[in-house]
Amino acid sequence: TLPERKDFDLTPRELEVLSLLPSGATANAIGAVLFLTEATIKTHLANLYRKLGAANRAQAVSIGIENKLITNQ
């Protein structure tokens, strides 16, 4: 059987931000795509890192892919 997907209690917006991280986009660029300020994106990133137990973007992307929260792009 496949391992169960962990959702880490991420909000829909946090999942949206996580899905944009593999592109290497800056917080400002992600904000432009989602019509949010850079500060708001940085808050979402801080929450993502905390919930995922990630130290940085690369680790967040790795955890996201391993847990099927994002697909390889």
Q: Whereabouts are the PLM-identified features?
A:
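Intrinsically disordered, low-complexity segments enriched in glycine/proline and serine/threonine
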Residues: V17-S19, I41, L45, T71
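Flexible loop/N-cap segments at domain edges
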Residues: G53-A55, A60-T71
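Acidic-residue sensor for enzyme active/binding pockets
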Residues: E14-E16, E38, E66
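Regulatory hinge/linker segments at domain boundaries
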Residues: T1-L20, Q73
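Recognition helix of helix-turn-helix DNA-binding domains
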Residues: G24-Q59
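Short, locally clustered residues in the helix-turn-helix/winged-helix DNA-binding domain
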Residues: S19-S23, I65
